[in-house]
Swiss-Prot record:
Matches recorded under SUPFAM superfamilies: Cysteine proteinases
Source organism: Staphylococcus aureus (strain MRSA252)
Sequence repeats, residue ranges: 75-78, 88-91, 98-101
Protein name (record): Staphylococcal secretory antigen ssaA1
Compartment(s) of residence: Secreted
Region (3 X 4 AA repeats of Y-N-N-Y): 75-101
Domain Peptidase C51: 134-255
Purpose of the protein: Not known; immunogenic protein.
Matching InterPro entries: CHAP_dom, Papain-like_cys_pep_sf
Range of residues in the leader sequence: 1-26
Highest taxon of the lineage: Bacteria
One family name in Pfam for this protein: CHAP
Length: 255
């Protein structure tokens, strides 16, 4: 069974994905989706609402009861699809695309990764490597000596919402998506560099919306402990991880 996958992600966090499948012979005749002359051909679309509920629309000779329940879908430019002991991985990094194929069956779970989950998520490591441009730098205001800017205007459940509250609201409430935070912070007078420090905000432009986390502390070996929301466990879920010193140098830090 060969599958063709097309994914579209809405800016509001609502995801729509379309799948089409048919056998290898049919694929040679029709590579564009559902074929009414193919007994195994089908296509379907589904949307995911704000509560993470799936809503399906089906066309063809298949039905939802046949959908494999151990598929994992990752959004924000990192997609993994596991079907019939075959795993297809697509990594998107700006304008570059890398496709890997392996015949090894992999265990997968139903996890929903929504906007703001930064760098490529790994199920085998708590460390993530990203590459960012040189951090802009400015001086004047600081998180430690700042004052609350007002109400939290970021989307509830997202990484930006959590970090704003975690720093006591002592940053701008209209900096936009996490990918924009470093430049917005520098423009507002905060110092932005690649040096981690307890109480700082870790930021990356990786992912569809970028990602931000709160720096809880820096260990003696240079590794960085962060807490964050909506990273690998869905909107509204706060988790923590430790990032190696080498990898931490690839992030921006807002002070």
């Amino acid at each position: 069974m060969k599958k063709i996958v097309t994914a579209t992600i809405a800016t509001a966090g609502l995801a729509t994905i379309a799948f089409a499948g048919h056998d290898a012979q049919a694929a040679e005749q029709n590579n564009n989706g559902y074929n009414s002359n193919d007994a195994q051909s089908y296509s379907y679309t589904y949307t995911i609402d704000a509560q993470g509920n799936y809503h399906y629309t089906w066309t063809g000779n298949w039905n939802p009861s046949q959908l494999t329940q151990n598929n994992t879908y990752y959004y924000n430019n990192y997609n993994t699809y596991s079907y019939n002991n075959a795993s297809y991985n697509n990594y998107y990094n700006h304008s570059y695309q890398y496709n890997n194929y392996t015949n090894n069956s992999q265990t997968a779970t139903n996890n929903y990764y929504t906007g703001g989950s930064g760098a490529s998520y790994s199920t085998t490591s708590n460390n993530v490597h990203v590459t960012t441009t040189a951090a802009p730098s400015s001086n004047g205001r600081s998180i430690s000596n700042g004052y609350a800017s007002g109400s939290n205007l970021y989307t509830s459940g997202q990484c930006t919402y959590y970090v704003f509250d975690r720093v006591g609201g002592k940053i701008g409430s209209t900096w936009g998506n996490a990918s924009n935070w470093a430049s917005a912070a520098a423009s507002s007078g905060y110092t932005v560099n690649n040096t981690p420090k307890a109480g700082a905000i870790m930021q990356t432009t990786q992912g569809y919306y970028g990602h931000v986390a709160y720096v809880e502390g820096v260990n003696s070996n240079g590794s960085v402990r962060v807490s964050e929301m909506n990273y690998g466990h869905g909107a509204g879920v706060v988790t923590s991880r430790t990032i190696s010193a080498n990898q931490a140098g690839s992030y921006n830090f807002i002070h």
